[in-house]
């Protein structure tokens, strides 16, 4: 199976090479959506979660990009722990992680797992990044 996922965040990291343990560097996840596809490309599962802000706010500059305000995420979001549980279920079913510039999203979620001391297999799976030299101008 192939897991395609994307996140929306509170912004961008100051240093893309910083370790995931540098919590001040990595922005917070405010939304995650994913699809699981089988080997024939058929959609098996789709999930989309707004994440309730836990001791952080969503800056206006980020809200202007993705449209998710602190108020919206607070009202309609779910606990990050629920997201971890559901995402780990999806990770347990997949052989590959796929996405456009997916390293960013992997780091965002990896930093979230680290912040909360949750073990994940996210960093153990092979990655297929659709952001190639040919598509780089679109990234």
Regions found by a protein language model. Give the residues of each.
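Glycine-rich, highly charged phosphate/nucleotide-binding loops
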Residues: 75-85
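Alpha-helix initiation/capping motif
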Residues: 23, 73-76
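Acidic-residue sensor for enzyme active/binding pockets
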Residues: 8, 23, 112
């Amino acid at each position: 199976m192939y897991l395609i996922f994307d996140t929306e965040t509170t912004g961008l990291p100051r240093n893309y090479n910083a370790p995931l343990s540098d919590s001040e560097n990595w922005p917070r996840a405010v939304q995650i959506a994913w699809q699981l596809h089988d080997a024939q490309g058929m959609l098996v599962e789709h999930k989309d979660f707004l994440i309730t802000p836990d001791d952080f706010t969503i800056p206006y500059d980020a809200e202007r990009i993705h449209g998710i305000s602190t108020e919206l995420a607070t009202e309609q979001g779910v606990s990050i722990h629920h997201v971890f549980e559901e995402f780990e279920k999806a990770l347990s079913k997949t052989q590959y992680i796929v996405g456009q510039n997916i390293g960013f999203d992997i780091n965002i979620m990896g930093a979230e797992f680290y912040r909360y001391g949750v073990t994940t297999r996210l960093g153990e799976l092979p990655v297929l990044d659709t952001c190639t030299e040919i598509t780089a101008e679109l990234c």
